[in-house]
């Protein structure tokens, strides 16, 4: 099933990451040291905080509404699909059941990040820019921050499946962080699947469970739908890309994203004030 979409999707993966991937493919294969990362960073502490934010977010820091976005894309059911329980995945710029969400799920200011596991710019963003954004808007429950995948390569697909394998936000954040931190050690290796399997096992996903997830229609169709949806956005040129209530930001700098978020927060406050005065 995957082979029918990887090639056309790959053509959409443009300037943001192409040069870096070409250069890195020629690097000498490195040995991955995942255990050291798991022991020496404070990922688990951040995971717990993010999970608490997602599950126990304040209900009305910014009042929720149902009128944020209207565009949606539905992926057609596969002709080869045999499982009648798998339904076409519908994607919008709102929060849905398939999304991995940090912060306040009920906020009506929704920031959607599109990233690729093999994208060097995405790794840079998460290591240098995201922590400040998280502290300012996510930890304070001001926004719903949705992390979605753009699948450009087979490596992207397999890494994204590993991150979603357990299905909960804690596990997703753990693997999301490690996959990006260790990107140069697995993404361009001929043994990338073996290295991802090692990452999974050290993070609590045994090889057999990872194999089952790789064969999961539900996970794969979610990733396909996420990718196809953003690929149809008029201004989408690559990853990372950000949308605030459906409007794409200029770039992935802290200033650009903060300006867009602050504007959306102010608009929602004014809207709430006007509704109360009626």
Swiss-Prot record:
PROSITE patterns: THIOREDOXIN_1 (PS00194), THIOREDOXIN_2 (PS51352). Residues 1-18 form the signal peptide. It is found in: Periplasm. InterPro entries: Thioredoxin-like_fold, Thioredoxin-like_sf, Thioredoxin_CS, Thioredoxin_domain. Pfam families: Thioredoxin_4 (PF13462). Its EC number is 1.8.-.-. Belongs to the thioredoxin family. DsbA subfamily. This is Putative protein-disulfide oxidoreductase RF_0032. It comes from Rickettsia felis (strain ATCC VR-1525 / URRWXCal2) (Rickettsia azadi).
